Amino acid sequence: MAEKSINIASWPCLSNGLHYNWLVDYAAFSAFGTFELSAEEWEKRDLIVNFKGNSELTTEIDHQQAVDKAIDLVSSFLKAVFSEKEGAKNSHSTLSQLTLVCLPASTQKHTERRFRKFSEEVCAATGMQNAYNAFSFTTTKDENGDEVDTLHLDETFFQGKQVILFDDIIASGGSIVRFAEKLEKSGAKVIAAFALGKKIPDGYDNNE
């Protein structure tokens, strides 16, 4: 993993001005115009695919190993960014004052599979508050009889919270922007966002 800046002010911004970062580059099938990747690039891609865990090629062992690796990577990164030494630079004193919010997936099943253990262990390692239980789902059926999960959030939980948003992958960044706006309407202050991976090429950074 390439070294990432721990100074949030130096991170690129999404369309709403929110600073964000990521840990590994994710090569999409269109990356580089071909799909001839190095061993390291395949390893990074596999980490994201296996973490998401919704590929038929992902075994349960692959998924759990990817979750465990992500827990270590993310915990270490958060400790570096929000350590007491860097607190003044980033305007936050300790991780214990921050709340980790993992962006829910489209279904309850995928949300639990990706983020339940992940958020519990990252927060245990860093001392952050875990927002996982502030989200719930109701399930209905559409006109075709297919189940549809609807996300609900406990707005009172987020009042006054300083939030770090996390997603498994950033593509356009739109989902993070929309979710940040929703949290801020509930009274939270979104400090920054980061992801396990970022799809390349992108073309949506402010400086690109």
Annotated model-derived regions:
Residues M1-L95, F135-Q162, S172, K198-P201:
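Active-site-facing substrate-recognition patch
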Residues G173, V177:
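Glycine-rich SAM-binding Motif I of class I
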Residues F118-D142:
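Histidine/lysine/aspartate-rich catalytic loop segments that bind and position anionic ligands
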Residues D168:
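Active-site-proximal glycine-rich helix-loop-beta segment
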Residues T99-L100, Q162-I164:
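Structural motif
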Residues Y132-T140, S186-D205:
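ATP-dependent adenylation/pyrophosphate-handling site
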Residues E121, R178, K182:
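Active-site signature of alpha/beta-hydrolase-fold catalytic machinery across serine-
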Residues H92-S106:
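Short glycine-rich phosphate-binding loop at a beta-alpha junction
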